């Protein structure tokens, strides 16, 4: 494992090994310090609570030092485009930035959200891939325009921890939100669920389909792992007999770069596409999951997120353990 950009870079066996390693860290059965005397650069283009805190603490618990950098705030503004004429507001090119960090650090984590402006460009993850292009040390994706693999691995770990091994009936449901959001979390949750072999239902209103190429990969991974994928446009029946409910909002590709149009189209779905007690009652005693932060009584009711079915805090904690497993695998001496 030389880098960690998406779960699809790894095999099903690799993913299960990471989960098992993360469980050992959580249970206190792995006290190794593979980062002793070593530093990791963590580059954040965007705000963060769970990713930033869990990565910084995880590096420390593995014996290492985390160097926090925020381009445009605690470091220079960055240009990533090849051949760019840098006569505007960008001070340094990723080519130098990354290679200099590689002389100081043994790995670089990068968080760079979708700007929600140009779908065809952003779906290629240009900033993340420019880091990977120029780096001589491993790159860890801490959320990009298309993928959030660390979150997805914490999600898979949480499902295993709460429900045991084996194939589960998993629902990824779109939820109403006052503005369009990036697709990285739903993309990665769906992809990892398929790789593990779960029976995946994706529920969303018409017009909120995930990327077609990615869906092809999700279906292929599910077939190889013995799982299934079913996409539905009605919310209530989607909950029937489900064991895991994962709620997340995302924007429409049809209105990418035009948020006011997306907001108008999604308006009728307010309330109906919220996880509530009535929908959860249709499930097979399902656990409720969300990556956080979550808007209460918009995405999910207080009654659900505060219930014993909710595992969102455990899910957030597991970010720490699974990222330690990722770091240990990447950087084992």
What are these model-derived regions, one by one?
Residues 1-57, 72:
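Positively charged, low-complexity intrinsically disordered leader regions
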Residues 33-41, 48-160:
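Phosphate/diphosphate ligand-binding glycine-rich loop within oxidoreductases
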Residues 120-141, 257-283, 308-309:
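A short, gly/pro- and small-residue-rich
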């Amino acid at each position: 494992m030389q880098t960690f950009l998406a779960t699809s870079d790894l095999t099903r066996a690799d993913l299960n090994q990471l989960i098992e390693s993360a469980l050992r860290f959580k249970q206190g059965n792995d006290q190794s310090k593979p980062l002793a005397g070593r530093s990791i650069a963590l580059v954040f283009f965007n705000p963060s609570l769970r990713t930033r805190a869990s990565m910084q603490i995880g590096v420390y618990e593995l014996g290492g030092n985390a160097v926090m950098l925020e381009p445009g705030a605690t470091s220079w503004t960055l240009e990533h485009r090849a051949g760019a004429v840098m006569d505007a507001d960008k001070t340094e090119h990723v080519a130098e930035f990354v290679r200099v960090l590689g002389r100081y650090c043994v790995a670089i984590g990068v968080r760079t959200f979708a700007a929600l402006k140009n779908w065809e460009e952003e779906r290629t993850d240009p900033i993340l891939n420019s880091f990977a292009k120029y780096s001589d040390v491993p790159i860890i994706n801490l959320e990009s325009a298309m993928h959030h693999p660390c979150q997805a691995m914490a999600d898979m770990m949480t499902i295993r921890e709460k429900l045991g091994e084996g194939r589960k009936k998993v629902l990824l449901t779109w939820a109403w939100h006052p503005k369009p959001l990036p697709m990285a979390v739903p993309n990665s949750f769906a992809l990892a669920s398929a790789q593990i072999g779960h029976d995946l239902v994706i529920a969303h209103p018409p017009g909120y389909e995930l990327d077609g190429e990615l869906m092809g990969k999700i279906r292929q991974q599910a077939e190889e792992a013995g799982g299934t994928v079913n996409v539905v446009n009605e919310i209530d029946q989607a909950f029937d007999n489900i064991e895991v409910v994962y709620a997340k909002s995302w924007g429409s590709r049809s209105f990418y770069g035009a948020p006011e149009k997306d907001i108008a189209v999604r308006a009728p779905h307010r309330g109906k596409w919220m996880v509530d007690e009535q929908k959860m009652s249709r499930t097979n005693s399902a656990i409720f999951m969300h990556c956080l932060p979550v808007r209460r009584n918009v995405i999910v009711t207080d009654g659900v997120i505060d219930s014993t079915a909710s595992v969102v805090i455990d899910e957030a904690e597991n970010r720490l353990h699974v990222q330690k497993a990722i770091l240990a695998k990447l950087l084992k001496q």
